[in-house]
Amino acid sequence: EKIKICLQKQVNSSFSLHNGFGGNLYATEEKRMFELVKPKAGASVLNQSTWIGFGDSRTDKSNPNFPRSADVSVKTANKFRSLTGGSLMLSMFGPPGKVDYLYQGCGKHKVFYEGVNWSPHAAIDCYRKNWTDIKLNFQKNIYELASQSHCMSLVNALDKTIPLQATAGVAGNCNNSFLKNPALYTQKVTPPXXKCGKENLAFFTLPTQFGTYECRLHLVASCYFIYDSKEVYNKRGCDNYFQVIYDSSGKVVGGLDNRVSPYTGNSGDTPTMQCDMIQLKPGRYSVRSSPRFLLMPERSYCFDMKEKGPVTAVQSIWGKDRKSDYAVDQACLSTPGCMLIQKQKPYTGEADDHHGDQEMRELLSGLDYEARCISQSGWVNETSPFTEEYLLPPKFGRCPLAAKEESIPKIPDGLLIPTSGTDTTVTKPKSRIFGIDDLIIGLFFVAIVEAGIGGYLLGSRKESGGGVTKESAEKGFEKIGNDIQILRSSTNIAIEKLNDRISHDEQAIRDLTLEIENARSEALLGELGIIRALLVGNISIGLQESLWELASEITNRAGDLAVEISPGCWIIDNNICDQSCQNFIFKFNETAPVPTIPPLDTKIDLQSDPFYWGSSLGLAITAAISLAALVISGIAICRTK
């Protein structure tokens, strides 16, 4: 007796329909193309091989109490240039009795965790009771220049020429010594014949290189005394006070001249010392000062100014019972491109009150890893391009955009059954199993989607009648990816310029940046909608080709025992081919594996340079589809006599 065996429709109401370009899908499940990510609080880096840290005892491996004294891991401590008791400002000025460490090193991203050793607790005087304002200005200049340089170094000995009448001086309020920078020089005079002394003329040279470190710009402390009145300085009738630095052309670049500038007018009778931070190019400079006193620059920090990169400043404060300042915090917040890491609780150490704080260890644990994005809001290492909330600037790397969860397109998942495509770009193959808008029937295929985005099905189908070549899909991906990049390039340039200018008190610029980023997010969501439709078509056509191969295999296995009378239907004589014979022909998985479509592995990679300077919108969408068709045990067939 002859019977007709056909593949039977298997879609029910539990399936959802997904429309795509080139084919549609029914699916038992669905999932969002990307999940929202949440930034992790604290510091991290984009590349472990291109960052350097500058620290003190809390990052010093040579500290006898390490690692209990540290706020970082052993791995991270290896990246720091540190010495217990040190700080960049201590090395700049060299107050007597304090640690003097040669800070130098190179890295695209610089992390600063130091500063606490010069704070009110240190009680440094030397003609100034409160150094916090000078520290604020110093740290701000360090962060600014570090963000534009690959290498930086302390220059701890400048070439200089001192007038013969001047000798090194000391001060009682400076431990009967004085700072290493500036150095104090005095003239010994004998009233009344030589009561005033001679005007001082000195020279110093800022080098173009210090050791192996190139110096294109120097940070110099221009220090001078401040007198409340002419009478305070001019007790001997020696005219007005001045201390001025000139460049080689005679231009004033620093200092104070009370011959043209007024005195403070306060009632004090003891001078104070002020130090302005000035940025100077290499060269020879002259210093002129009024008789008796000369403050001479002896040190600088030099920067090569070769590469822009991120700067992270970590809040550096004491534990209980020691007075701290917040100059590091204020300096970073007022410097474009500086990310500040702040504690929420008082510093509580493990080794002692001031070393080994658990909260700080957690905030700095991200330095052990590489992140895709670093920002003031924290760091992200997930590949999703979306986050629930806007990441605060500054930010660097491939940073996600703010989006609402419901706005992210969904893709089919779980059990997938394709329908035929109607897209005009898909040509008809020589042989098709399923007509236009027919549901795939009979066999269920599981599509395993390993990531979020599939290939673009652009190009010609194979002459054998199924699918799209991997090469043509990749070319489609490349074309659309390039088109999207072209559309983004002008916006990226504008964002880069904005990030160069943005600071925490420029609210208008921040608002504009936020508006642009929101527009970028909406545009990306639109792009993903297109990608989702292409993905659906990709899977649909791929499964159709697999079914075509399956039908061909059925016909080949049947030989003369079954005759294909239409796509997906065969006539068989059950007197000749009994049940076991039919099982061999139709129930593949019980006897042999079903031939499956080769995995589709096509990618889209829309990204900027991972060190894209200042870009809050550097973005990467990297994903792949690996598609495998598997036959579920128990073929559903329709038999008619």
UniProtKB/Swiss-Prot annotation:
The active site is at S57, D352, H355. Keywords: Disulfide bond, Fusion of virus membrane with host endosomal membrane, Fusion of virus membrane with host membrane, Glycoprotein, Hemagglutinin, Host cell membrane, Host membrane, Host-virus interaction, Hydrolase, Membrane, Transmembrane, Transmembrane helix, Viral attachment to host cell, Viral envelope protein, Viral penetration into host cytoplasm, Virion, Virus entry into host cell. It catalyses: N-acetyl-9-O-acetylneuraminate + H2O = N-acetylneuraminate + acetate + H(+); N-acetyl-4-O-acetylneuraminate + H2O = N-acetylneuraminate + acetate + H(+). It comes from the Viruses. Glycans are attached at N12, N47, N130, N381. Residues 27-137 are annotated as: Esterase domain-1. It is found in: Virion membrane; Host cell membrane. This is Hemagglutinin-esterase-fusion glycoprotein. Homotrimer of disulfide-linked HEF1-HEF2.
